[in-house]
From Swiss-Prot:
It comes from Xenopus laevis. Sequence-specific RNA-binding protein that acts as a post-transcriptional repressor by binding the 3'-UTR of mRNA targets. Binds to an RNA consensus sequence, the Pumilio Response Element (PRE), 5'-UGUANAUA-3', that is related to the Nanos Response Element (NRE). Mediates post-transcriptional repression of transcripts via different mechanisms: acts via direct recruitment of deadenylase complexes leading to translational inhibition and mRNA degradation. Also mediates deadenylation-independent repression by promoting accessibility of miRNAs. CDD domains: Pumilio. This is Pumilio homolog 2. Residues 480-492, 606-622, 634-657 have a biased composition (Low complexity). It is found in: Cytoplasm; Cytoplasm, P-body; Cytoplasmic granule. Residues 850-854, 922-926, 994-998 are annotated as: Adenine-nucleotide binding in RNA target. Keywords: Cytoplasm, Phosphoprotein, Repeat, RNA-binding, Translation regulation. Residues 287-296, 493-518, 623-633 have a biased composition (Polar residues). Component of a complex with papd4, sympk, tacc3, parn, dazl and cpeb1. Residues 41-68, 265-296, 480-518, 592-662, 730-759 are annotated as: Disordered.
Length: 1173
């Protein structure tokens, strides 16, 4: 099996067989790069345990052990690339950390990482040159050279592992603490590495790549990076007799530690591999600079069952030596390496240069490092007075800066303020119910580089400023236990109970009742310290946690079963200002209701009083901050002239509404309340002061309304919004209304301007609701599919909306709403009528939207038709005159119920004349006349009385009058006949009037048509030759009575030759020949056969004429046989001549049709078709 790997930018292949390779010319014929193995050499010939090594050029060949791989793996510059075919192997009994997460893995900027990775790949001395290498270790007697510890200075045999020849001065993604190395060596320069002076990162990358390479028979001592005498392939006495030569790195290792590689020791590092792949005996792991600390060296430093004093600052992990819960089923010891301070360089976003610096809160991982100075991790054993004072002053400076510079004010709402107190342990949050950390990912498209360096469900506890809890202590003198617990910060929040996964929003939170007093205390602490009436900072609360005594403390509301655990995580620590804590003490002292003020909407008469107090405090505390804000969750009885601003709004809120909370025009009541427990369900459904029900996330929510602010808070589009997540990735879910004009540039890897990249709640879907793996590299395969996924789409698996969450105020530059724009761009292939609520009128006025509605209305249910009808009824007249909207109205006249037709007819009433004269309204009138009842028809037609001639002569109105004549009973049309008196000739010669005259002749009674026909007979000669009047005469010949036809024929007789050569009259002559009686037809034919036109007969003249030849053809068709014989004899002398004329050929073609059979009495009248006689 060949697995490709990148070596020095050359593609090579690993060979499964490890044959012995011999060197030629003093150097081995390396398998790397050549991809070949000498035939005849069996892999069984090598001794178990031989490590890959190679002989450097020029070295004596006597000391070169034969090996399967001819070159040391770590000396080759590997490009940092995961094996594409590697898949997760399951998590039944291993550590279940999320893929890609590592506790000590830090993040650096994308540009820097790309540069360093490429530098490693290009570090090879030549594209084809093979670097010198040496063996890492081999089997030999440990007592031969004595015990040697790992990573002692200058232990490399040759300069390959000597002084660094890499251009980097520090390892990638590692910042060293001054004066201390990773392995206890205080001289950083003495730690040597193949790729850098202090980290050995290049080797760790080699491990990372080689860990997934196929190595069926690799020595088992490499299992989990431990050098041991264990052998996966040897059992019984053979295993006990196997001896190994100590590695140069571990020559001073204690003998008792050599045999200490048991399962517990091998699994000392509880994190497993960084990508979550299960390690086995085939893994190649331990080299200098490995990402996993060596178990042996950890054992040397801290012992096999103790945890480093540097882990999590001063706090120990209570769960480290306990059997884990169902989330982490492994019963192994969970010992973590010492945490190293790692900083993140400035993000590649357009933040200002003078960003506010902040400490890494509690985790020892620098989440942010903003170009100012690096905040090293400080161990805080106690809160001194100087720290309290300095923190208060620093917070006051930030508040003053926000007041003076409004554009920086938003930084405080996203947690970009320094953490003054960081004695908290990790907090394990409650994930989304049923969510699996291995199948969920909270980014819209790709994995953002801002991952927490901690496992799933755990995030730094610096999100809660302890000063707020300490301030709340003054108001809770009767609850000293809970206050002490909060001030000490010894909190470890867990998911739910130890044996229970999060419940659904409608289920009771069972198993969370025992600690009622602690929960009540916690409710006061969070109510006062975290959700005061002070606006500004983003809040986060756990669902439950263990206090210092081991008691399970459940967050307020969660015990009542009002909401399931929905994780709300920001990408930065979220702090409370000291002013907020002071305000909590002032407003909520000795009062539980005051403690929860600002956190939940007040229930009862005290609500307005609390809101007035909040507004009064805000006016005093922030007179110049340009943040006209209410309490964090807003008020539900705000005045119309008030403004609100919320952390979750992309700018100042709309007047008279709240951007987040329980306001009367807002329904996102329990966005964070779902984590608190709230007064609502998982995502709202809270009631306003009026008591009316509002659907969650309705279109009235200000989250989806455009903000008048031109510059939102820094980082707001991807740190705010609905922070639902079951993954430790940063919350970066912009709302549909957020465009580039509303905020600074979002993270480059996230799509923030499409409704299709909105919120991903609980998992990563491919747009059709199907989940797929969130394993490293999987996002690239589904990146395009993830971009089309949307929390607001109609196929959402978690919260199927009743309709798409679009707001009518969200207008695109084209003038269309975002929903219509997305529909026109084919982003909603399964759009339904119910998804268009609020947009029916707009869609009806769009070409594609109107066609969509028309098609749906034909097959829609009565309920769906009524939904559409309720919206278009108010804009009925507007749609009737719209180029596309009129078709929707017509569809309702065609497929609507009688009540709907009656309602639309009522809308037409009083507007018949203007609609009849309008280009599109006239179509609606015509469709209405076809659909409504007789009484409604008569009522509608009467509006045209007095305006008949105006409508008849109008290009649109004439169609309405024609439809009236066709559909309405003749008795109701008497006013139209009266209007035509004395105007028949004029109207007959009118392009539109002639049509109305024909409709009258077709549908009206004889009594009504008689006066019209009398006027027509008086002007027959003129009308016959008129371009429009001839149609009226033809219509009388076709549909009139016999008397009327005879009168017209009499007018034509004697003028057949002349009228037949007229462009318009020739049509009337043809109709006379066709519809006249046999006697009248004979007179007309004899007239052309007997009449002479100069030297030739009239028939010859007519055969050559462009119009009269059609009359001759019609006579041949309609003539009696005797007359037809006469016509043939008259035509025969002119056959040769007719071939010279274009129109004469038409006559010859007609003759061929009837007489090609060579009638015996006529003989051969027509020659061959080729013209030869």
């Amino acid at each position: 099996m060949n697995v490709p790997c990148v070596v020095g930018m050359n593609e090579v292949a690993w060979q499964e067989s490890r044959g012995i390779m011999h060197a030629s010319s003093g150097q081995e014929a390396l398998g790397v790069g050549v991809g070949m193995v000498p035939s005849g050499v069996s892999s069984a010939g090598q001794a178990h345990g031989n490590n890959p090594h190679a002989m450097p050029p020029g070295a004596p060949s006597a000391q070169v052990p034969l090996s399967g791989r001819s070159q040391d793996d770590a000396t080759v510059g590997y490009f940092f690339q995961r094996q594409a075919g590697e898949q997760l192997n399951g998590y039944s009994n291993k550590h279940r950390w999320p893929t890609g997460d590592s506790i000590d893995a830090a993040v650096r900027s994308v540009d820097e990482m790309n540069h360093d990775f490429q530098a490693l790949a290009l570090e090879s001395r030549g594209m084809g040159e093979l670097l010198p290498a040496k063996k890492f270790w081999e089997h030999e007697d440990p007592a031969k050279d004595g015990q040697k510890g790992m990573f002692l200075a200058d232990e490399w045999r040759e300069n390959t592992w000597g002084a660094s020849h890499h251009s980097m001065s520090q390892p990638i993604m590692v910042q060293r603490r001054p004066g201390q190395g990773f392995h206890g060596n205080h001289d950083v320069a003495s730690v040597l590495s193949p790729r850098s002076e202090s980290g050995g990162l290049g080797v760790s990358m080699v491990e990372y790549v080689l860990s997934s390479s196929p190595a069926d028979k690799l020595d088992p001592r490499f299992r989990k990076g431990v050098f041991s005498v264990r052998d996966c392939e040897l059992d019984g006495p053979e295993k006990g007799e196997q001896k190994c030569k100590a590695s140069p790195f571990e020559e001073e290792k204690k003998r008792d530690l050599i045999s200490a590689d048991t399962d517990n020791v091998s699994k000392l590092n509880g994190r497993g591999l960084p990508n979550g792949i299960e390690s086995d005996c085939k893994d190649f792991n331990r080299t200098p600079g490995s990402r996993q600390a060596s178990p042996t060296e950890i054992t040397e430093r801290i012992g096999p069952n103790s945890i480093s004093a540097e882990v999590l600052g001063q706090h120990q992990n209570p769960m480290s030596n306990k059997p884990l819960s169902d989330e982490f089923p492994s019963t192994e010891s969970q010992n973590l390496d010492g945490m190293e301070q790692v900083g993140l360089h400035s993000l590649q976003f357009d933040y200002p240069g003078n960003q506010i610096q902040m400490d890494s809160a509690g985790a020892g991982v620098g989440l942010f490092d903003y170009n100012t100075q690096q905040q090293m991790f400080q161990r805080q054993n106690a809160l001194t007075v100087q720290q309290l004072t300095a923190a208060q002053q620093q917070q006051q400076q930030f508040t003053l800066a926000a007041a003076q510079q409004p554009h920086l004010a938003g930084m405080f709402s996203t947690g970009l303020a320094p953490a003054a107190f960081v004695p908290n342990p990790y907090i394990i949050s409650a994930g989304h119910p049923g969510a699996d950390p291995y199948t969920t990912l909270a980014g819209p498209a790709v994995v953002s580089p801002q991952y927490y360096g901690i496992p799933w469900g755990v995030y730094p506890a610096g999100l809660f400023q302890q000063q707020a809890a300490a301030a709340a202590q003054a108001a809770n003198s009767n609850n000293q236990q809970a206050a002490t617990q909060a001030s000490q910060g010894q909190q470890q929040v867990m998911r739910a109970t130890s044996n229970q996964r999060p419940l659904t929003p409608n289920q009771a939170q069972q198993g969370q009742q025992p600690e009622s007093l602690a929960a009540a205390n916690q409710a006061q602490i969070f109510g006062q310290g975290l959700a005061t009436s002070m606006p500004g900072y983003q809040l986060l609360t756990p669902t439950a946690y263990y206090d210092q005594t081991g008691a399970l403390v459940v967050g307020p509301g969660a015990r009542a079963g009002l909401a399931a655990q929905v994780r709300l995580v920001a990408s930065a620590p979220v702090l409370l200002s000291p002013a907020a804590a002071q305000a909590a003490t002032a407003t909520g002292a000795n009062s539980l209701t005051g403690a929860t003020n600002g956190m939940f909407r007040q229930m009862g008469p005290q609500q307005q009083q609390q809101q007035q107090q909040q507004q009064h405090q805000q006016q005093q505390q922030q007179p110049n901050a340009n943040l006209h804000s209410n309490s964090f969750y807003g008020n539900s009885t705000m005045s119309n002239n008030s403004q609100s601003s919320s952390l979750f709004s992309p700018g100042p809120g709309q007047p008279g509404s709240t951007s987040l909370g329980f306001g009367s025009s807002n329904s996102l009541g329990a966005a964070i309340g779902s984590a608190f427990g709230g007064f609502g369900s998982s995502v709202g459904n809270s009631a306003g002061s009026s008591g009316s029900r509002r659907d969650s996330l309705s279109a009235s929510c200000d989250l989806y309304k455009r903000s008048s602010s031109s510059l939102a808070a820094i980082g707001q589009p991807y740190y705010n919004s609905l922070g639902f997540s079951s993954s430790p990735s940063p919350i970066s879910m912009p709302l549909p209304s957020q465009t580039s004009g509303h905020s600074l540039t979002p993270p480059p890897s996230l799509s923030s301007h499409g409704s299709s990249s909105s919120l991903h709640l609980g998992g990563l879907t491919n747009g059709s609701g199907r989940y797929f793996s969130a394993a490293p590299g999987a996002e690239a395969k589904y990146r395009s599919a993830a971009n089309t996924s949307s929390f607001f789409s109609s196929n959402s698996q978690l919260f199927p909306p009743s309709r798409l969450r679009y707001n009518r105020a969200d207008i695109m530059p084209s003038g269309r709403s975002r929903l219509l724009e997305d529909f026109r761009n084919n982003r909603f292939p399964n759009l339904q009528l119910r998804d268009l609520m609020g947009h029916i009128v707009e869609f009806s006025q769009d070409q594609h939207g109107s066609r969509f509605i028309q098609q749906k209305l034909e097959r829609a249910s009565p309920a769906e038709r009524q939904l559409v009808f309720s919206e278009i009824l108010q804009a009925a007249y507007q749609l009737m005159t719209d180029v596309f909207g009129n078709y929707v109205i017509q569809k309702f006249f065609e497929f609507g119920s009688m009540d709907q037709k009656l309602a639309l007819a009522t809308r037409i009433r009083g507007h018949v004349l203007p609609l009849a004269l309008q280009m599109y309204g006239c179509r609606v009138i015509q469709k209405a006349l076809e659909s409504i009842s007789t009484d409604q028809q008569s009522e509608m037609v009467r509006e045209l009385d007095g305006h008949v001639l105006k409508c008849v002569k109008d290009q649109n109105g004439n169609h309405v009058v024609q439809k009236c004549i066709e559909c309405v009973t003749p008795q109701s049309l008497h006013f139209i006949i009266e209007a035509f008196k004395g105007q028949v000739y004029v109207l007959s010669t009118h392009p539109y009037g002639c049509r109305v005259i024909q409709r009258i002749l077709e549908h009206c009674t004889p009594e009504q048509t008689l006066p019209i026909l009398e006027e027509l007979h008086q002007s027959t000669e003129q009308l016959v030759q008129d371009q429009y009047g001839n149609y009226v005469i033809q219509h009388v010949l076709e549909h009139g009575r016999s008397d009327d036809k005879s009168k017209i024929v009499c007018e034509v007789r004697g003028q057949v030759l002349v009228l037949s050569q007229h462009k318009f009259a020739s049509n009337v002559v043809e109709k006379c020949v066709t519809h006249s009686s046999r006697t009248e037809r004979a007179f007309l034919i004899d007239e052309i056969c007997c009449q002479n036109d100069g030297p030739h007969s009239a028939l010859y003249t007519m055969m050559k004429d462009q119009y009269a030849n059609y009359v001759v053809q019609k006579m041949i068709d309609m003539a009696e046989p005797a007359q037809r014989k006469i016509i043939m004899h008259k035509i025969r002398p002119h056959i040769t001549t007719l071939r010279k004329y274009t129109y004469g050929k038409h006559i010859l073609a007609k003759l061929e049709k009837y007489y090609m059979k060579n009638s015996p009495d006529l003989g051969l009248l027509v020659g061959p078709s080729n013209g030869m006689l």
